[in-house]
């Protein structure tokens, strides 16, 4: 069996996805390096959202670069959703055929009074379950309903099944950040290479 996760020299192939996406509403460029060190360089014009993207990189141990220019004079909806679309597409490209990945990941993350949970299946079957009763409508200038919109856009475009749940909490900032951190930990586990996994981790023989 040929190990397609290695290049012609026998070294593990680099897993990087790059996407540039421009519409009448946004202009976005992202690079996602799955075998990274938790580095982030992001600027979307939405400070709280930048902080959340930093959490994804840091806690998944991936490297993430994102630049977004959007119609923030209206609101942040297009910028956040379209960044999710671009990141989902970049993740899908970085994964290739999914050879040698662990596929599944899950994590509980406590953040003071909040307990958040995430489960990821790199399945090729996009789906989102988002179960979080966020008490505040805004954190800074960030509309909190955009957290769900971001994760939906990412999951649909990456081809992953994603379950997110806040089991309990009171502080909306903590609840959203807990979800981003839990997602990061779960994703990091799911996309990690495992030398025991020969080929694609599916009895169908393909993930995508």
UniProtKB/Swiss-Prot annotation:
Its main location: cytoplasm. GO terms for biological process: L-histidine biosynthetic process. One of its GO terms (molecular function) is imidazoleglycerol-phosphate dehydratase activity. Pfam families: IGPD. It is found in: Cytoplasm. Keywords: Amino-acid biosynthesis, Cytoplasm, Histidine biosynthesis, Lyase. One of its GO terms (cellular component) is cytoplasm. CDD domains: IGPD. Belongs to the imidazoleglycerol-phosphate dehydratase family. This is Imidazoleglycerol-phosphate dehydratase. It comes from Symbiobacterium thermophilum (strain DSM 24528 / JCM 14929 / IAM 14863 / T). The gene is hisB.
């Amino acid at each position: 069996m040929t190990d397609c996760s290695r290049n012609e020299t026998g070294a593990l192939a680099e897993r990087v996805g790059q996407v540039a996406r421009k519409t009448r509403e946004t202009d976005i460029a992202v690079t996602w390096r799955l075998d990274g060190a938790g580095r982030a360089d992001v600027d979307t014009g939405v400070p709280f959202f930048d902080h959340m993207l930093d959490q994804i990189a840091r806690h998944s141990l991936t490297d993430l670069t994102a630049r977004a220019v959007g119609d923030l004079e209206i609101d942040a909806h297009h910028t956040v959703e379209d960044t999710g679309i671009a990141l989902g597409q970049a993740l899908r490209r970085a994964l290739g055929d999914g050879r040698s990945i662990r596929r599944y990941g899950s994590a509980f993350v406590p953040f003071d009074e909040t307990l958040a949970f995430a489960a990821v299946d790199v399945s090729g079957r996009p789906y989102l379950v988002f179960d979080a009763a966020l008490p505040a409508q805004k954190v800074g200038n960030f509309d909190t309903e955009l957290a769900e919109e971001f994760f939906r856009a990412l999951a649909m475009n990456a081809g992953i099944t994603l379950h997110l749940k806040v089991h309990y909490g009171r502080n909306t900032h903590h609840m959203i950040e807990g979800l981003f951190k839990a997602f990061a930990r779960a994703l990091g586990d799911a996309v990690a290479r495992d030398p025991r996994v020969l080929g694609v981790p599916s009895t169908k023989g393909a993930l995508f």
